[in-house]
């Protein structure tokens, strides 16, 4: 699992916990790797770590399943993101991240104005759009790596990636079945303890 995937999952879990508890809360994973938050002396900075597992208020049966990750989709995603999925575990982690993100579709956002920017309440002064030092055409074209008849020449297109035949997609599905079985077993045991 690469570092950016881990960071995304920790941040995403944090946001869902904020929705669940209605206050800022920091999970055990965040406390382990975030020494600033763990050692914060600010009284307004409340840290809540539940002592017992808390069932998710999201009905997992309503969560949309991630798409089937075939070789064509994996190659397409690799081209778009410039991230290569070197093994089955990387594809499985991507599938889990998509499954986790699909939970957001179940969050009711009616009547909530979308946040466009964190700085929407701050003034943003702009200067007048007047050229200070106008440049000549020759000076502008000096920036081009290649010029044809006083025009910039765009670089060649990206070379397409080769499809990796190394990935065993049945292993990804096997990982998926195992993890879902563990989650269902955990949810059942937590439900039995709470009842």
From Swiss-Prot:
Keyword Transcription belongs to the record: no
Identify the domain of life: Eukaryota
Q: So which residues are the signal peptide here?
A: none
Recorded catalytic activity of this chain's protein = L-glutamyl-tRNA(Gln) + L-glutamine + ATP + H2O = L-glutaminyl-tRNA(Gln) + L-glutamate + ADP + phosphate + H(+)
Subcellular location per UniProt equals: Mitochondrion
Q: To which protein family does this belong? A: Belongs to the GatC family.
The record's listing under SUPFAM superfamilies reads: Glu-tRNAGln amidotransferase C subunit
Q: Which residues cross the membrane?
A: none
Keyword annotations from UniProtKB, A to Z = ATP-binding, Ligase, Mitochondrion, Nucleotide-binding, Protein biosynthesis, Transit peptide
Its BP terms in the Gene Ontology are:
glutaminyl-tRNAGln biosynthesis via transamidation; mitochondrial translation; regulation of translational fidelity
Enzyme class, top EC level, equals: ligase
Q: What is this protein called?
A: Glutamyl-tRNA(Gln) amidotransferase subunit C, mitochondrial
Q: Where is the transit peptide?
A: 1-18
Can the keyword Nucleotide-binding be found in this entry's annotation? yes
The record ties this protein, via Pfam families, to:
GatC (PF02686)
Cellular component terms (Gene Ontology): glutamyl-tRNA(Gln) amidotransferase complex; mitochondrion
- A GO molecular-function descriptor: ATP binding
State the EC number(s).
Answer: 6.3.5.-
The role this protein plays is:
Allows the formation of correctly charged Gln-tRNA(Gln) through the transamidation of misacylated Glu-tRNA(Gln) in the mitochondria. The reaction takes place in the presence of glutamine and ATP through an activated gamma-phospho-Glu-tRNA(Gln).
| Assembly and interaction partners | Subunit of the heterotrimeric GatCAB amidotransferase (AdT) complex, composed of A, B and C subunits.
